Amino acid sequence: MKPKILPLPNGPYYLINDSTRTRVPNLQGNNGEPLSTVVGIALCRCGQSKNKPFCDGTHSTVGFSSKNNDNDQPVVNKRKSYVGSKITVHDNRAVCAHAKECVKNRLAFDLSARPWINPDKDTVESIIETVKSCPSGALSYSIGGVEYRDQTREPMVTVSKNGPYVITGGVELMGDSVFGEGASLEHYTLCRCGASKNKPFCDGTHFEVNFTDS
């Protein structure tokens, strides 16, 4: 059974490792009935817990809001396709967490060039590996009219250094969160600094606010 993540309103992420209700030892109701719950942990997403990555309740004292604006509107999609002779790269800037993994490949991904993605400047194999390195799911690629965006791997939540939670392996994001157009459901990044304008997803704002694990 794969884990799930539930972003609680104005509160932490609840990582549910086992959604099967399990009896809690040494706990009962007032009539002596056994009490059970799912197995999970609360992960900080306000950015100010003194016990990161775990929630310590600080969100309630700092006035953390899980909304992005007064209307709590989802981010506007910015998906574009960059067509090459052998491979097409799809990119949604609105989903990007600005991890900068893609620009390590300066041949096909060059922020100083226009267009900044040119699939014909590198090999198909290299471009595929670059797309796979994108943690946010903003990048995907098509070959022969078939789009590829997901990978096969075990579910995992990784606490990146001074950055977001990196989700891989198809961990289900519960609730009404809106994924961007073309975004991967298998891998994505969740805001940990509390300042993203696209909550619950990371938009790179942790760089602007100088978020740290300490």
Predicted regions and their residues:
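Ferredoxin-like iron-sulfur electron-transfer modules
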Residues: 32-45, 77-98, 108-129, 146-150, ...
